[in-house]
Amino acid sequence: MGFYQGPDNRKITGGLKGKHRDKRKYEIGNPPTFTTLSAEDIRIKDRTLGGNFKVRLKYTTTANVLDPATNTAKKVKILEILETPANKELARRGIIIRGAKIRTEAGLAVVTSRPGQDGVINAVLLKNESQRS
C-alpha cells in the first residue's frame, strides 16, 4: 500500500475542500526504511519514477568508514548505535540514519550516507573520539 503525499482534502477549519482532480501516481510515496543491525545484510530494490531503481538497506552489519587522518576507507563491523541528533527515539530503537553516531571496530564514527536510500552505510571517523575507544 502506498503513502499518499499529495494535497490534503481538509481545510484549516476542518471542512472538506472541493475535489478538483484525482490522485496522481507520482504523489504516491513509500514508508520509511528503518535500517537496523542484524546478522546479515538485506537490501530491497524498489522501482522509482522513470524506471530507475532505489536500493534500500534494511539490515546491516558493516559500514565503510573513512579515516580523515590517513585518508583511507575500511569496511568495519558496527558494534552499536550511540545517538541520533534527529530523533533520540531512533537511536533507542537501533535505527541508523544520516548523522547518527555509531561505534565501530575502528572507533566512533558519524554516518554520512542515507542508508534507506543509498543501500550502503558510509561514515567518517571522529578525530578526538577514535583515540579513546
Swiss-Prot record:
Taxonomy, superkingdom: Archaea
Region spans: Disordered: 1-31
GO BP: maturation of SSU-rRNA from tricistronic rRNA transcript (SSU-rRNA, 5.8S rRNA, LSU-rRNA); translation
Pfam families, sorted: Ribosomal_S8e
Alphabetical keyword list: Ribonucleoprotein, Ribosomal protein
UniProt xrefs under InterPro entries: Ribosomal_eS8 (IPR001047), Ribosomal_eS8_CS (IPR018283), Ribosomal_protein_eS8_arc (IPR020919), Ribosomal_Se8/biogenesis_NSA2 (IPR022309)
GO cellular component: cytosolic small ribosomal subunit
Subunit and partners: Part of the 30S ribosomal subunit.
Similarity remark: Belongs to the eukaryotic ribosomal protein eS8 family.
NCBIfam families noted in UniProt: eS8
Listed name of the protein: Small ribosomal subunit protein eS8
Gene from which this protein is expressed: rps8e
